[in-house]
């Protein structure tokens, strides 16, 4: 009788669902966080592309300087990311305009605006998993427009 009760308890699967949930839930949460973080990186990349295009559009207009373009690009990135408190050095690390002047020497010149931004995957959480080469990527956006006279 006692032997039969012990065998029945050993074969019982009570609590197995909780153990399976404890094993699967962290993996599932990490996958969902990765999907959300990838979507945020794509949103940041699209914002940088739009900001580069806006900067190039401003740069081809007469009377605008490189500082004007940098200010507009930084404003666009801040509005696009919703981070109004971010400083320009953390939002846009480089704005390159080629040629670097308000008006080029010849009328058919092209203006290229290049933006770079370092995106940290999973934010500060990536350091918990050892970081590595996939903890951050450099997003680069470039837009070229021809100056019409």
What are these regions (language model features)?
Residues 2-75:
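Alpha-helical assembly-interface signal, strongest on the long, hydrophobic N-terminal helix that forms
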Residues 2-3, 54-149:
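Short, conserved structural patches
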